[in-house]
Amino acid sequence: MARVKRGVVARRSHKKVLKAAKGYYGARSRVFRVAKQAVIKAGQYAYRDRRNKKRNFRALWITRINAQSRAEGMSYSRLIAGLKKAEITLDRRVLADLAIHDKPAFAAIVAKAKDALAA
């Protein structure tokens, strides 16, 4: 079997990793062995946090909705129950946006939820 000289392939592979590690601190951006580990770990963090981001935003939306709905005299859980009963299908992202930027519209939605719970 012929000998395989890896010069070009190895150089390309190293360049790819070092380019991905650009901006990292110290040896993590300069030494291939360390940079490779850093890039792999960064990928793991990115994968994990793309999922956590969804949870964090949902929690933020719920906090905002709860704060505004309490100002309107209703707890978050009662509001969601009222919306389900009134068959209003607005997701939490939209509700949170209304709670922050369009308080009169949010107040109208809370009023409808209250009516649905009273009925």
From Swiss-Prot:
PANTHER family assigned to the protein according to its UniProt record, in alphabetical order: 39S RIBOSOMAL PROTEIN L20
GO biological process: ribosomal large subunit assembly; translation
GO cellular component, one term: ribosome
Organism: Teredinibacter turnerae (strain ATCC 39867 / T7901)
Keyword Transcription: no
Similarity comment text for this entry: Belongs to the bacterial ribosomal protein bL20 family.
Main function: Binds directly to 23S ribosomal RNA and is necessary for the in vitro assembly process of the 50S ribosomal subunit. It is not involved in the protein synthesizing functions of that subunit.
InterPro entries (alphabetical): Ribosomal_bL20, RIBOSOMAL_L20_CS, Ribosomal_protein_bL20_C
The protein's name in its UniProt record: Large ribosomal subunit protein bL20
Cited CDD domains: Ribosomal_L20
Keywords linked to the UniProt accession: Ribonucleoprotein, Ribosomal protein, RNA-binding, rRNA-binding
GO molecular function: rRNA binding; structural constituent of ribosome
Domain of life: Bacteria
